[in-house]
């Protein structure tokens, strides 16, 4: 099958781009021919600016050559932020609607879709695009939330988030700790991902501060989109980590190998998100064999595995951290 993929792509520092690369590699391994349409800062086969819907028009123009067109959808990938970009947003939505109408083989993998704002023309057009496309989601709860937000019934298929995750780094906990120069026996908790308020890493720091015992909490991540909210949040997190004994913030982009090494080295990966649809970090942890402490938001509850722990409050998060610091081991890290 000949497949076009529309997505951000490495070397851009973007989790969805990394996901798209892994999923494209899987498709190629299955014998499909894959052509990636990426922004200029990605290593796609075709590179166009993701502005004003140009990526969708390019896919539509080339569409006759493909049996399937897969669009990786997350608003931040395709829409310029801010009120001054209103016309650009309309053009982007028009581009996507034109693509799905002209090329019915288009599939939209929805990583995230912000709640619909009915008064905005770009959202009206976007809703029409979704209505004509075949949609994919990672969890049933994401699909249901999408239907509530957009007030529409749409058939959809679910895809395992792990299909877009490839790990080839260190999986053994002891080896990962040696690689990172860490104490082999000290309790280690890790938060990993982009620094933004919805990740809730500040919740983990406060819960760690409220617990007792040996151990470290390491936050590994960087700001992906330099919005004022994200920049302010990173600054606050920096101050909070510096003021909390046992907490380290390793700010900056990390290679897949080092990212996976930190996850493998951890006794628990902590995902204290305040808003999420699904989590690539959780999928990576599951493939690496690291249990996670996961907030009950969005589709995460549906994504958790048998060794993961779901928390529904800050106090439950504190108690989960306390158990690890007290030496209690649950699951495969015994």
Segments predicted by a language model, with ranges:
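A short helix/loop element that forms part of the nucleotide-sugar donor recognition site in Leloir-type
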Residues: 169-182, 235
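Conserved donor-binding/catalytic core segment of Leloir-type glycosyltransferases
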Residues: 182-199, 205-208, 217-220
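Conserved acidic donor-binding segment of nucleotide-sugar-dependent glycosyltransferases
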Residues: 306-316, 323-328
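Donor nucleotide-sugar binding/catalytic pocket of nucleotide-sugar-dependent glycosyltransferases
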Residues: 130-171
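Acidic donor-binding loop of glycosyltransferase active sites
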Residues: 261-277, 290
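Nucleotide-activated donor-binding/catalytic signature segment of Leloir-type glycosyltransferases, i.e.
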Residues: 231-260
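Glycosyltransferase donor-sugar binding loop
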Residues: 216-235, 252
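Membrane-proximal helix-turn-helix segments that form the acceptor-binding/catalytic region
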Residues: 90-102, 118-135, 237
């Amino acid at each position: 099958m000949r497949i076009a993929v529309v997505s951000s792509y490495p070397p851009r520092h973007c989790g969805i781009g990394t996901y798209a690369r892994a999923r494209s590699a899987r498709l190629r391994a299955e014998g499909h021919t894959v052509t990636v349409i990426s922004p200029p800062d990605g290593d796609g086969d075709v590179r166009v600016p993701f502005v004003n819907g140009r990526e969708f028009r390019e896919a539509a123009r080339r569409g006759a050559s493909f049996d399937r067109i897969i669009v990786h959808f997350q608003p931040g990938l395709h829409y310029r932020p801010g009120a001054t970009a209103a016309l650009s947003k309309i053009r982007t939505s028009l581009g996507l609607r034109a693509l799905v109408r002209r090329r019915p083989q288009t599939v939209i993998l929805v990583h995230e879709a912000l709640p619909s704002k009915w008064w905005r023309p770009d959202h009206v057009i976007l809703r029409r695009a979704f209505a004509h496309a075949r949609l994919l989601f990672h969890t049933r709860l994401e699909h249901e939330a999408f239907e509530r937000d957009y007030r529409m019934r749409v058939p959809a298929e679910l895809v395992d988030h792990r299909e877009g995750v490839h790990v080839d780094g260190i999986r053994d906990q002891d080896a990962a700790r040696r690689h990172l120069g860490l104490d082999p026996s000290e309790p280690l908790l890790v938060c990993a991902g982009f620094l933004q308020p919805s990740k809730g890493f500040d919740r983990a720091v406060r819960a760690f501060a409220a617990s007792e015992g040996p151990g470290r909490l390491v936050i590994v991540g960087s700001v992906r989109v330099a919005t004022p909210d994200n920049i302010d949040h990173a600054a606050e997190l920096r101050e909070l980590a510096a003021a909390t004994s046992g907490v380290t913030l390793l700010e900056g982009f990390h290679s897949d190998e080092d990212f996976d090494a930190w996850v493998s080295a951890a006794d628990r990966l902590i995902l204290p998100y305040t808003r999420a649809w699904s989590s690539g970090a959780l999928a990576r942890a599951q493939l690496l064999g690291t249990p996670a402490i996961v907030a009950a938001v969005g589709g995460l509850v549906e994504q958790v595995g048998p060794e993961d722990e779901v928390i529904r409050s800050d106090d439950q998060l504190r108690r989960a951290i306390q158990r690890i610091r007290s030496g209690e081991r649950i699951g495969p890290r015994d």
